[in-house]
Amino acid sequence: MKFIVKLYPEIMMKSKPVRMRFTKMLETNIRNVLKKVDDDAKVQRQWDRIMVMVPKNKPELAQAFGERLACIPGIAHVVQVDEYSFTSVDDIYQQVLPVYRDQIAGKTFCVRVKRTGSHDFNSIEVERYVGGGLNQFTDAIGVRLKNPEVTVNLEIEGDKLYMVTKRIEGLGGFPMATQEDVLSLISGGFDSGVSSYQFIKKGARTHYCFFNLGGAQHEIGVKQVAYHLWKTFGESHKVKFVSVPFEPVVAEILEKIDNGQMGVVLKRMMMRTAARIAERMGIQAIVTGESLGQVSSQTLTNLNVIDRCTDMLILRPLITMDKQDIINECRRIGTEDFAKSMPEYCGVISQKPTVKAVLAKVEAEETKFSEDLIDRIVEQAVAIDIREIAEQMNTRITETETVVAIDTNEVVIDIRAPEEEENKPLEIEGVEIKRIPFFKLATQFADLDKQKTYLLYCERGVMSKLQALYLIEQGYHNVKVYRP
C-alpha cells in the first residue's frame, strides 16, 4: 500500500531550481512528520510527486499516515493506492475486474486513467478497454462519463499499475520553511489562531508571541491553541512560544493614558515589544489577526498610527475577511472551542475609544510611560521550544493526580480527536466513558455532574495534562489524568 502525494500547483509553476528545492523540502517535512508515527515510514521523492510507502507488515498505519499527510502544507491532494504489475492492457483489465466487480454492481461508473512513461497505448485506450470490459462482464447499470456513482481511478507508471482506493485533500500552500520565519501575535481568540494558520499554510515557520494580560489561566489556554496549531499543521519544524508579562504595561495605560487613546496605545506597545523580540530571534515580520473595521483600533486611520511605532513589517492576513468567515475557518482548523472559552482582555481597556487617532496626540500620551518600561518587559519575556509545553505540564500538574486505576464514582473522559477515537476506541469494562474531544472540553465540562470525578484520557497524555491544568485554573477540582 502506498500514498502518492501530489504537489500544490503553485509549486509546479516554479522554475526548475525552485521547484526542486520546494520538493526536497516537502519530502523532508513529510518524513519528519511520519517518522513520529512510525520509524519504518518510507518517503521517496520523484519529479512531480512524492511516494509514501506504508510498511507491508503494518497496514493499520494507513489511516494515521493519511490523516497526517492531509495536514502538511504544500500538498494539493493525496491518493491512497494499491500497487500491481502488468504486461498489457488486458492484464490491467483482468486485475481491475475482481477489485471493482462488486463495487459497481447496480451502479453507473466510469474509468479514469493517468499515465506516465513510454507505452504502446494511451490513457483513453485503457479507459475504453477497461470500461468496456467492466460494462460487459459485471452487473453495473452502465457507463456514465458525467457524475457517475463510482469512478474507477487508475494510475500507470512504467510497468506499475496503481488502483486508487482513496483520495485525501491536502492543505495546499507551500512546504514549511520555504518562506522566512514570522512572529505571530496570538491571544487564543478566533482571529489570531486563523492568522497563524494562514502563515503556516504559506510555508513560513510561525513562532508565537503571547502578551499575558490575564494571569496563568489565560496563558495556559493560549498555549493549548498554539500547541494544537503546531502539532496539527507545523510539527515538521521546531518553533518558539514567547510569553510576555504585559500587566505592567496595562497598569500604566490605565493610570496615565487618556481614555480615548488607550486601545491604540496598547496595540502600539504590543507592536514595539513584538518587534524587539522578533529582532532578537532574527525574524523580519510580525503577524496579527486584525481585520479592517472589526473593532475601534482596526480602522484604517488607527492601523496607520499603530504601524508608525516600528519599522518592522506587520502582516495582516485577515484584513478583508468577514468575522463569520474567520469563525468558519477557526472551526475547520479545530480552534473554535478554544476561542469560545478564551476571555477577551483587550476589549475592556477603553470605554470611549477613538476611531481616528491622531499620531501627534498618541505620541504625546506615550511620553507618560516609564522610560525603561519596554526594556523591562522584553527582558522578562520567556521563550520556550513549543515542545516544552507538554513537558511543563508534567511539572505544573501538581494540583491534580495522574492515576492508573479507576475507582467507583469516577468517569473516564476520552478527549482524543474523533478520528483518533474511532481508530482506537477506548473500552474499559464496568467503567463509564464519555467522549468529549479536547477542543470541546472547556465549554462542556461545566454541564457534567459535579458530584463525580473525571479522569481525562489521551493516548500520549500531553493534551490530557494541558486540559486538566486548564480546568483546575478555572476552579474545577474533580479532575485527574488517566494514564493506564
From Swiss-Prot:
Tell me the domain of life. Bacteria
A GO term for molecular function? CCA tRNA nucleotidyltransferase activity
Task: Indicate the segments forming the THUMP domain, all copies.
Answer: 63-167
Any one GO CC term of this protein is: cytosol
The family database entries (Gene3D superfamilies) matched by this protein are listed as: 3.30.2130.30, HUPs (3.40.50.620), Rhodanese-like domain (3.40.250.10)
Q: What is its main location?
A: cytoplasm
Q: Which UniProt keywords apply?
A: ATP-binding, Cytoplasm, Disulfide bond, Nucleotide-binding, Redox-active center, RNA-binding, Thiamine biosynthesis, Transferase, tRNA-binding
Residues annotated to bind ATP: 185-186, 267, 289, 298
Q: Which SUPFAM superfamilies match?
A: Adenine nucleotide alpha hydrolases-like, Rhodanese/Cell cycle control phosphatase, THUMP domain-like
Q: Where in the cell is it found?
A: Cytoplasm
Similarity-based family = Belongs to the ThiI family.
Q: What is this protein called?
A: tRNA sulfurtransferase
Give the gene symbol. Answer: thiI
